[in-house]
Design a protein with these regions (language model features):
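Append "and occasionally in soluble cytosolic enzymes with long acidic Gly/Pro-rich linkers
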Residues: 274-371
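Extracytoplasmic/peripheral linker and loop segments enriched in polar/acidic and small residues
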Residues: 384-393, 418-480, 497
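Gly/Pro-rich hinge or "lid" segments in bacterial periplasmic/extracellular proteins
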Residues: 162-223, 325-326, 330
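Extracellular/periplasmic solute-recognition and catalytic clefts
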Residues: 201-203, 209, 215-269
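Aromatic- and charge-enriched surface segment that lines or borders ligand/interaction sites
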Residues: 68, 98-140
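N-terminal lobe/hinge region of extracytoplasmic solute-binding protein
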Residues: 54-102, 133
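Periplasmic binding protein-like
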Residues: 54, 229, 377-424
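Surface-exposed binding/hinge segments that line
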Residues: 101, 106, 141-184, 198, ...
């Protein structure tokens, strides 16, 4: 089997070029200051004439801890600031936070003393704890905070966060909005914040210059936003394509790579699905083809569990995204699967015959499941695609009652995948937590091994197979076509002054 491991390592072409500059990692037992956020004329869009109009869902409310629409969540980021912002490269910058230090399972964040909150005292540690508790329980921010169990104010400008495990990259999770204590308790509340704008009478007014006004037009759903853009009522439309509905809108369209990872779950408790066969499956899957055909071009093929546009991906991974039939067959043959039994290859002990379950509510994913089944058939696999209701699909996964499943998960700003390797999560059933891809992950997050070393291990074992990252799209009117989207997918309006 050592020969198989060598083949996987060499032929997959994991050209791991590790950079000495690691912007996201915090040194152990240290406190690292975060640079002030700066905005230049070259990468910002200035509101000067009060004519910019953005969509607003009035029934959803502007409270960021209760809002569910993208329109209002993105609007709220102009009104409220996070501890750390996360840009399109998944690099973090301290906004309300001045610094962060990691010691064991504790992250200590120091708050800037001069974060002004209009009409209130400056933001302090108690406000951060209040905001964290609301974010942890919220629809949009809750999943981002997996791995952070609680927060406690140590003094007026220091917050201690308790972690599930030592995590030098945890700042990427801390992009939730900070508001003043007691101002965000209900859906109809308009919390007090420290952002560039404040909300009043269905419009946003610049804190620095009251003449800078952003008008808001009420919209009830995504279709109404798009209609409003097409007739010139609003200047921005965004869709994450979760409804699988792509329309051609009037304006300047920009495709945005989201943090939504499409992946193939593999049950390692099935005898045939050892790390070698899993690697053969990963080699044969053509991520580029799935992105282009199954997702109609609205995805980016990538075979590591890190965002393809992130700094980490640029430093670490060069993995072939096209299918490699020769490599897959080589691995399968060396595992003894050299003859057929019916329509599937066998090694005498196991048969390469599996079921692949998929949620029937997502037609992109259903198409991808059949694509994978057809592709693997070329190497002697017999894959029975089972299209299930969401309830049945979810129950099968959480109970570990599956061979393979095609899933999707939204990664947070730190690209944490610990949920796949921790007991008790719906993602971990069927994953062998004693294999190196699981155990080494926590050493990587603790800073004991480099990102280069960890993702090399992952690509040798593939506890699950990342397939692609979905994309959404933004349409900008002619009036704001120069708006910089450098903070997407986390902040649509980050480029507005």
């Amino acid at each position: 089997m050592k020969k198989i491991a060598k083949i996987i390592t060499l032929v997959l072409c994991i050209s791991l070029c590790f950079s000495a500059c690691k912007g996201k990692e915090i040194s152990e037992e240290s406190t690292t200051s975060s640079p002030e956020q700066t905005t230049s004329a070259d990468d910002s869009f200035a509101i000067t004439d009060g004519k910019v109009v953005l969509p607003y869902n009035k029934t959803d409310g502007i409270n960021p801890f209760f809002a569910e629409s993208y329109e209002n969540i993105y609007l709220s980021m102009l009104i409220y600031e996070p501890l750390f912002s996360v840009d399109s490269n998944y690099d973090t910058t301290g906004i309300v936070a001045d610094s962060i230090g990691i010691s064991g399972k504790v992250a200590t964040v120091r708050i800037k003393h001069n974060v002004v909150c209009r009409g209130y005292e400056n933001i302090n540690a108690h406000d951060v704890v209040y905001s964290f508790n609301l974010a942890k329980a919220s629809y949009y921010w809750g999943n981002n905070l997996d791995g952070i169990t609680n927060a406690q104010a140590i003094d007026d400008y220091t917050v201690s966060f308790s972690l599930n495990f030592k995590d030098l990259y945890v700042a990427g999770k801390m992009n939730f909005p900070i508001v003043k204590t007691g101002t965000a308790d209900s859906k109809n509340s308009i919390p007090a914040g420290s952002g560039k704008y404040y909300f009043t009478q269905d419009r946003l007014v610049s804190v620095a210059d009251g003449n800078k006004i952003i008008s808001l037009v009420e919209t009830s759903n995504r279709d109404s936003v798009e209609d409003a853009l097409n007739i010139g009522m609003v200047d921005v439309f965004f869709s994450d394509l979760s409804d699988e509905n792509y329309k051609v809108a009037v304006g300047n369209t920009k495709e945005i790579t989201l943090s939504n990872m499409i992946y193939l779950g593999l049950n390692s408790n099935r005898g045939a699905l050892n790390k070698y066969i899993r690697s053969a499956i990963a080699a044969k899957i053509d991520s580029d083809n799935i992105a282009l055909s199954s997702y109609q071009g609205h995805a980016v093929g990538f075979k590591l569990p890190i965002a393809p546009e992130s700094t980490v991906a640029g430093n670490v991974a060069k993995i072939e995204t096209k299918g490699n039939k020769e490599l897959a067959n080589n691995i399968i043959d060396r595992c003894g699967y050299t003859r057929y039994s019916g329509s599937a290859k066998t090694n005498g002990a196991y048969l390469l015959s599996f079921s692949l379950i998929v949620n029937r509510d997502n037609q992109f994913r259903v198409a991808a499941a059949y694509n994978i089944a057809d592709s693997l058939a070329e190497c002697g696999f017999l894959i029975n695609v089972q299209v299930l209701s969401f309830a049945d699909y979810s129950e099968r996964i959480s109970s570990g009652n599956y061979d393979m499943y095609l899933g999707e998960v939204k990664l947070d700003g730190s690209m944490d995948i610990s949920r796949f390797f921790m007991d008790g999560t719906k993602f971990s059933a069927g994953i062998n937590k004693s294999e190196k891809a699981a155990t080494e992950y926590f050493r990587y997050r603790a800073g004991e091994i480099s990102e280069k070393e960890y993702y090399e291990v992952f690509a040798e074992e593939y506890p699950f197979v990342p397939v692609a990252f979905r994309t959404g799209y933004t349409v900008l009117s002619e009036d704001i076509k120069t708006l910089d989207l450098k903070q997407m997918p986390f902040s649509l309006y980050g480029g507005i002054q």
